[in-house]
Amino acid sequence: VIRFNPLGLNEGATPEAQLWVIMAQIQQELELRNRAEMLVTDRAVVDNFAYLLRTTGGEDPFSVRPLVRRWCETYDMFVRLLPDVPLKVDGVRSTNTRFRNEIEQILDTILPSFIPEDRLITVRASEITERFDWGSLIERLVGLPEEAENVVAQPVTLIPTLWD
């Protein structure tokens, strides 16, 4: 979502830019939610809310806190990656360690009030390698698969979106 923000991002973002990101995130999730059984995002609205709070010194000038709180209820699981790896230039994400730490401090403060502990899994980013056991996280989310006989694999059709 952030890649398409016409109003600024990262350290230069304005409150309006962060509001745009929150609304665009929700809009995109609404559009995609009926296209698949499971939707995985690399950022949740609560992350974007943390960026908004940073731009406003902790204030909520658009009164989106209730919307963000309610929208967090639509997620079955949150996997928080603790940023313990060096920042890399990718043309979008900030490489400013201080900025990253400010966002992490805000998340440390707000996550407990937005996300129930039983739906939050915290993992150090350095643990995410080719050998990381994503299967156990999926099992935690959906449960162990039942033994099924004569299961026929269904084809998957990917439909590009505006965001692809």
Language model segments and positions:
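Short amphipathic alpha-helices and their capping/turn segments at secondary-structure boundaries
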Residues: 18-39, 62-75
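Conserved substrate/cofactor phosphate-moiety recognition/catalytic segment
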Residues: 1-26
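Hydrophobic helix-cap positions at the C-terminus of alpha-helices
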Residues: 28, 32, 110, 114, ...
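A basic- and aromatic-enriched beta-loop-alpha substructure that forms the phosphate/nucleotide-
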Residues: 34-57
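Alpha-helical elements of Rossmann-like donor-binding domains used by nucleotide-donor carbohydrate transfer enzymes
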Residues: 20, 24-27, 106, 136, ...
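Short loop/turn segments at strand-loop or loop-helix junctions that form parts
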Residues: 1, 42-45, 80-85
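C-terminal accessory "lid"/substrate-recognition subdomains
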Residues: 115-122, 129-164
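A glycine- and Lys/Arg-enriched "phosphate-lid" helix/loop adjacent to the NTP-binding pocket
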Residues: 55-132
